[in-house]
């Protein structure tokens, strides 16, 4: 697992191990629950993409970054990007999608499927993001190395995801789980129109950059 240096050696190792375990459980539960529905569409959802990014970083990339001294300078930038990407998942779900999900789940019979849905949603939308946030706050080193461009760099993943989703919607058709060519209602051009969706995406992007800049500014003010 992760080789840590500095004052949070043991805590960092424990948290990184827990994050890997939580990510594996969340992704596995999600895939298994929908296994009979053709999971080629699994990564049409940003939630799954961001949880996979967390898993790949803490299970594979972090080990390389922390053990190769020549790569140490990349750690604060990589860990900030991973934290912001997964916190975007948490914020969009909690602030935008949760009311509709809660309404749908409330009417489900209290079966094993219901428990899986509730547990999985909690893991991938809350437990993993907040665990990564705690790790970043307590264990991620050299946060003072972050600068305003980092507020843009981390958005590469959600931007790439958005571009690929709109391309997919044009050529691939309906996502079975969503009942639409678009994975999330606020991206549905057929419902809101291209101008409205562009406005929503632009506003969300500006908020993402502003959040990144605010965090970086706070770090430098509090140093």
Predicted feature residues:
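Aromatic-rich, lipid-facing transmembrane alpha helices and their immediate juxtamembrane interface loops
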Residues: 1-223
């Amino acid at each position: 697992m992760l080789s840590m240096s500095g004052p949070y050696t043991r805590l960092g190792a424990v948290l990184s191990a827990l994050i890997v375990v939580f990510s594996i459980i969340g992704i596995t539960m999600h895939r298994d629950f929908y296994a009979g529905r053709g999971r080629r569409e699994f990564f049409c959802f940003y939630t799954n993409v961001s949880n996979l990014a967390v898993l790949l970083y803490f299970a594979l990339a972090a080990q390389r970054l922390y053990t190769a001294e020549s790569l140490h300078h990349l750690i604060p930038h990589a860990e900030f990007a991973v934290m912001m990407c997964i916190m975007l998942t948490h914020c969009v779900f909690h602030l935008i999608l949760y009311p509709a999900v809660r309404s749908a789940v409330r009417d489900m019979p209290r079966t094993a499927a219901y428990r899986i849905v509730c547990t999985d949603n909690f893991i991938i939308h809350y437990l993993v993001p907040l665990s990564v946030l705690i790790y970043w706050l307590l264990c991620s080193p050299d946060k003072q190395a972050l600068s305003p461009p980092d507020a843009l760099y981390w958005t590469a993943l959600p931007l790439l995801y958005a571009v690929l989703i709109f391309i997919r919607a044009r050529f691939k058709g309906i996502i079975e789980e969503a009942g639409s060519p678009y994975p999330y209602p606020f991206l549905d051009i057929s419902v809101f129109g291209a101008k409205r969706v562009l406005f929503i995406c632009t506003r969300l992007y500006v908020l993402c950059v502003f959040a990144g800049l605010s965090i970086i500014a706070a770090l430098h003010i509090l140093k």
